[in-house]
Amino acid sequence: MLLAPGDVIKRSSEELKQRQIQINLVDWTESEGGKEDKTEPKEESKAEGSKDGEGTQSESGQKEEGGKETKDADVDRRIHTAVGSGSSTKGPGERANENADRGDGKVGGGGGDADAGVGATGTNGRRWVVLTEEIARAIESKYGTKIDVYRDEVPAQIIEVERSLQKELGISREGVAEQTERLRDLRRKEKNGTHAKAVERGGRKQRKESHGDAQREGVEEEKTSEEPARIGITIEGVMSQKKLLSMIGGVERKMAPIGARESAVMLVSNSIKDVMRATAYFTAPTGDPHWKEVAREASKKKNILAYTSTGGDAKTEFLRLFDHL
C-alpha cells in the first residue's frame, strides 16, 4: 500500500484505474464563506472509480487552477491574429474555430497523417506548432504525434491549449504559465510590429499566387481577403481532444490495462487512517492540506519506504514508482 498527496492521486486516477489499483481518497472542499475544510473519504473500487474519480478530479482541478490563471487563459477566448494585417481581416483559422464551437469538429486544412504519427500539418501545408516543450511532450506521449515548438518563425500556425485540454494532457501549472507568457510576448511583438517586415517581404509573392488561383476558381475577392492570415501568425484556441486530433492527426493511445497483480501496490491513499498498513509513501509539493500530517506520521514508522519528488512533474514521478515497486 502506498501513501501519496491527494492532488497527485487525483491527477493520476485514470492511470491507477487502468492498473486496477484501488484508491482511498480523503478529499477537501473549501466553502465560499471561509469555513474550515471538510473531509469526505471516498473509496473507489474498480467499478465505481470510472464515474466518481473523473468528476471529482475535474471539479477540484478547476478550483485549484482557476484563481491563478489570467485572462489570457480564459476558456472562451479565441485569438486569430494575422501579423501585419488589419483587425477586420477574417482568415480561415476563424472559420475553423467557429465550426469547432458548433460541435462538428471540422477544422480547415487540419489533416495530417494519423498513421505516420510524426506530423501536424495545418492550412496551406504549414505545420501546427505549440508554445512549450511540455505541451509538445504531452501530445506526443498521449497521441503519438510529434509536434514542433514555436521558435519565432513567420508565418506560423500556433495551437493554444486551453483549460479543459490542459487537464486532459496533464499540463502542470508551470506549463500553463509558460504558455501564457509566450502568448503575451506574441501580442507585444504584434503591437510593436516586430514581424511586420518579414510578413511584408513574403506578401508580394503570395498576393500574386493568390490572384492567379482566384481567377481560376472565380473567387478572387475571397482569396485576397484570406491572404494576410496565410502569411502571418494564426493562434488557434483548442479546448477539446477531438478538435486537437483533427488538427494534428494521430489517435489516442489505448494502453492495455496493467493488472494490480503486476505491481506490488494494491491501494493508494492519502488518509492518515491508512498509515499503519502502508508500506511506502511518496511526497511532493502539494495543495492537500492534510498531507503534511500524514507524511509526518508515516515517517515515524519503521521499515517504510520513502520516496520524494525530484522537482519534476509529480504525476510522472508518482506513476514511475509502480514500475519499480
UniProtKB/Swiss-Prot annotation:
**Bias type Gly residues, positions:** 106-122
The protein, known as:
Helicase VP6-A
Can you name a GO cellular component term?
Answer: viral inner capsid
Domain of life, per the record? Viruses
Q: Which reaction does it catalyse?
A: ATP + H2O = ADP + phosphate + H(+)
Keyword terms, alphabetized: ATP-binding, Capsid protein, Hydrolase, Inner capsid protein, Nucleotide-binding, Virion
Binding residue positions for ATP: K106
Q: Output compositional bias ranges, type Basic and acidic residues.
A: 8-18, 32-54, 61-79, 92-105, 175-229
Q: Name one GO molecular function term.
A: ATP binding
Q: Where is it predominantly found?
A: virion
**Pfam families assigned:** Orbi_VP6
EC number of this enzyme: 3.6.4.13
Keyword Nucleotide-binding present in the record's keywords: the answer is yes
The answer to whether keyword Glycoprotein applies is no
State the compartments where it is located.
Virion
Q: How does it assemble?
A: Homohexamer.
Q: Which family does it belong to?
A: Belongs to the orbivirus VP6 family.
Function in brief: ATP dependent RNA helicase essential for RNA packaging and viral transcription. Possesses ss- and dsRNA-binding capacity.
Q: Where is this region: Disordered?
A: 1-126, 175-231
